[in-house]
């Protein structure tokens, strides 16, 4: 069996505790930024897994350092995979539950239907819209709604929409906008022959961007 110096053992223990702290911090971050519960629990589970592995190492004391190294490796691997997945797929990992008594900041109407629900994070506040058309209105003229007191001024951080055809949440920049009955509707796969508007142009021209 390999022999380890005391300082090497100390480094391994410090790294183990560091990974556990990172797991807790990420779990708290996800919880307070509206991510789904299963991803919050998954990151918290990394901490519990690390503790369990290290407790097992204490039972088999001669192999403690090997258990600690395994804990570091597994924690780093799982956390990295979770972070990459959450960052790449926010539309799948975030929770878009409509708050009680939420009103659209454009029409100020209580949102009852979620068929075309949209959400935008501006500054530190998240706003919900009853239609994609109202979302686009705000993106084009945010100052008007700031002056009316409907929203607080801030930087546009996240915009998500529920598509009409698939009912899936998508990033606003990834959908296709189609004009229907005088208003804009978000599609993942627009109808054939429909005139499509690129939402990225709206984002580029928005004073919030």
From Swiss-Prot:
It comes from Aquifex aeolicus (strain VF5). It is a multi-pass membrane protein. This is Uncharacterized protein aq_1428. GO terms for cellular component: plasma membrane. Keywords: Cell membrane, Membrane, Transmembrane, Transmembrane helix. It is found in: Cell membrane. The chain crosses the membrane at residues 10-32, 37-59, 64-86. It comes from the Bacteria.
């Amino acid at each position: 069996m390999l022999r380890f110096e005391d300082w090497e053992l100390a480094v391994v223990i410090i790294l183990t505790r560091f990974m556990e702290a990172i797991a807790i911090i990420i779990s708290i971050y996800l919880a307070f930024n509206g991510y789904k519960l299963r991803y919050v629990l998954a990151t918290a589970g990394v901490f519990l897994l690390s503790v369990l592995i290290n407790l097992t190492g204490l039972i088999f004391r001669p192999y403690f350092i090997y258990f600690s190294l395994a804990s570091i490796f597994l924690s780093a691997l799982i956390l990295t995979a979770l972070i990459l997945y959450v960052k790449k797929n926010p539309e799948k990992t975030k929770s878009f539950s409509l708050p009680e008594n939420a009103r659209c900041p454009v029409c100020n109407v209580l949102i009852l239907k979620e068929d075309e629900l949209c959400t935008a994070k501006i500054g530190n506040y998240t706003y919900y819209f009853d239609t994609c058309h109202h979302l686009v209105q705000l993106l084009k003229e945010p100052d008007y709604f700031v002056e009316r007191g409907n929203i607080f001024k801030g930087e546009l951080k996240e915009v998500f929409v529920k598509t009409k055809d698939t009912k899936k949440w998508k990033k606003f920049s990834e959908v296709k906008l189609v004009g229907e009955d005088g208003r804009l509707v978000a599609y993942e796969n627009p109808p054939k022959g429909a005139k499509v508007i690129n939402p990225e142009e709206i984002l580029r021209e928005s004073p919030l961007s």
